[in-house]
């Protein structure tokens, strides 16, 4: 259970298959991995300041953008498109992070307390996030915007086409961090 991140469409062209991404102008952050991901699946990634996204959708400077439901609703982005396509290409992993030196310096009983408290807090945060997502989806659907879910084959095609991006990330960060992230996605 994680907050999903997806691609938003502003025109009457829904995404049902991998080939539907080809040539689409998708607003991304100015992040080399985001740009590489969208290029790998055939889209035309367009770095753009977030403050320009609403107008970019409105004026068709961009066809789509990637954001979680919270951002879509809080910025009224759903007003400028007919479809929300749940690509789930980026998870929003809710976790508690603590300085390793600080944690190791704690007595064992306090480490156990912190570990248990972190599990409880993380579960609560995920439940709250899930509830907010349900609320945001309802608001989007009430506006007339359709929410589409990609089929397993399209997800597999995306995964295969973007594998080189993940390999690049893996080469540039600590393997333990990469593996923890990927394990979080799987679980």
What is each PLM-predicted segment?
Residues 1-5, 9-187:
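N-terminal secretory/targeting leader peptides
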């Amino acid at each position: 259970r994680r907050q999903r991140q997806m691609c938003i469409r502003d025109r009457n062209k829904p995404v049902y298959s991998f080939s539907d991404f080809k040539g689409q102008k998708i607003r991304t952050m100015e992040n080399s991995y985001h740009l590489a991901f969208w290029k790998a699946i055939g889209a035309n990634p367009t770095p753009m300041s977030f403050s320009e996204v609403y107008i970019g959708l409105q004026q068709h400077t961009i066809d789509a953008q990637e954001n979680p439901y919270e951002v879509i609703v809080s910025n009224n982005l759903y007003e400028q498109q007919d479809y929300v396509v749940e690509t789930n290409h980026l998870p929003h992993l809710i976790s508690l992070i603590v300085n390793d030196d600080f944690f190791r310096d704690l007595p064992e009983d306090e480490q156990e307390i912190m570990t248990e408290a972190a599990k409880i807090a993380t579960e609560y945060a995920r439940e709250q996030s899930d509830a907010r997502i349900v609320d945001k989806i309802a608001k989007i659907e009430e506006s007339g915007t359709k929410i589409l879910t990609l089929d397993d084959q399209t997800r597999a095609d995306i995964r295969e086409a973007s594998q080189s991006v993940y390999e690049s990330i893996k080469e540039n960060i600590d393997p333990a961090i990469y593996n923890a992230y990927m394990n979080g996605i799987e679980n």
